[in-house]
Amino acid sequence: GGKDPGGISLSKYNEKDFTLSTVLKIKKLLEMEPMIKVVLTRSDDSYPTLQERAKVANDLKADLFVSIHANSIPAGSKSSPSGTETYYTRQESLEFAKTVHKYLIPATGLSDRGVRQSSLYVTRETKMPAILLECGYLSSANDEAWLYSEDFQQRVAEAVVSGIKEYLGL
């Protein structure tokens, strides 16, 4: 957010707009759950650093951390991937990643690119189960057409909430 637009889609949409819109939908759904307290690291067009995001979660001793994204590859690349991926770093996050991912795939209707381990800052430096969701590819015409639709974002939000609730046993 803020000065960092994130990835830029084929039609010149900013990743930050997809992510904020989707995250606000997730927040609205989670706030209906009496056992869940939601804290966002970004609720407007601001730019908290990765370090600040991890610090917020760690300082609050959050139970879970979810980072929402849309993937992209550089223009002119030989491949043009499409689909949804879920990333985690530490083994303690694997079950959470699998649980959310199983809801995300049917919700998006995009290719299943799997649950993958990667040392990403926010999933590595947070002290609770943490995942990063790549909900589609900005660099794919098919994915981009979905990413900016309200219906798609709502389905993603509902899938993430279903995964969180199942993981927490709610």
Task: Please place each PLM-identified region on the residue numbering.
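Active-site histidine-acidic residue metal-binding/catalytic motifs
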Residues: 1-54, 60-62, 74-75, 81-82
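Solvent-exposed loop/turn segments at secondary-structure junctions
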Residues: 1-4, 43-48, 70-76, 91-94, ...
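Alpha-helix initiation/capping motif
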Residues: 12-15, 19, 46, 89-93, ...
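Solvent-exposed, polar/charged alpha-helical surfaces in well-ordered, non-transmembrane soluble domains
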Residues: 16-32, 55, 59, 94, ...
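Sec/Tat-exported extracytoplasmic proteins
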Residues: 26-30, 34, 42, 61, ...
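Short, electropositive alpha-helical surface patch
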Residues: 48-64, 121-132
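Active-site-adjacent mobile loop/cap segments within catalytic or ligand-binding domains
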Residues: 67, 74-75, 85-87, 114-170
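A short, gly/pro- and small-residue-rich
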Residues: 79-95
